[in-house]
Amino acid sequence: MLSKEALIKILSQNEGGNDMKIADEVVPMIQKYLDIFIDEAVLRSLQSHKDINGERGDKSPLELSHQDLERIVGLLLMDM
């Protein structure tokens, strides 16, 4: 999970971010949303990788690349 401090720093880097006030109850909701988004991105990237490259018979670790994420990110953003 992204730390509260890191999340606040990221949110405050937008235009006019110095004047932005973030309510304490909002941060856990944003953290949860980001956790769900990241989990979904990983699962979709994994499925896309398997669809393109086929199932592997061995049990060696699977390595995802930025290309796997690029294939799914457009639809993922629309779905979220």
From Swiss-Prot:
GO molecular function terms attached to this record: DNA binding; protein heterodimerization activity
Keyword terms, alphabetized: DNA damage, DNA repair, DNA-binding
GO BP, sorted A to Z: DNA damage response; DNA repair; kinetochore assembly; replication fork processing; resolution of meiotic recombination intermediates
Cited function: DNA-binding component of a FANCM-MHF complex involved in DNA damage repair and genome maintenance. FANCM-MHF promotes gene conversion at blocked replication forks, probably by reversal of the stalled fork. Component of the kinetochore, a multiprotein complex that assembles on centromeric DNA and attaches chromosomes to spindle microtubules, mediating chromosome segregation and sister chromatid segregation during meiosis and mitosis. Component of the inner kinetochore constitutive centromere-associated network (CCAN), which serves as a structural platform for outer kinetochore assembly.
Oligomer and partners: The MHF histone-fold complex is a heterotetramer of 2 MHF1-MHF2 heterodimers. Together with MPH1/FANCM, forms the FANCM-MHF complex. Component of the inner kinetochore constitutive centromere-associated network (CCAN) (also known as central kinetochore CTF19 complex in yeast), which is composed of at least AME1, CHL4, CNN1, CTF3, CTF19, IML3, MCM16, MCM21, MCM22, MHF1, MHF2, MIF2, NKP1, NKP2, OKP1 and WIP1.
Family per similarity comment: Belongs to the CENP-X/MHF2 family.
Stated name of the protein: Inner kinetochore subunit MHF2
Organism: Saccharomyces cerevisiae (strain ATCC 204508 / S288c)
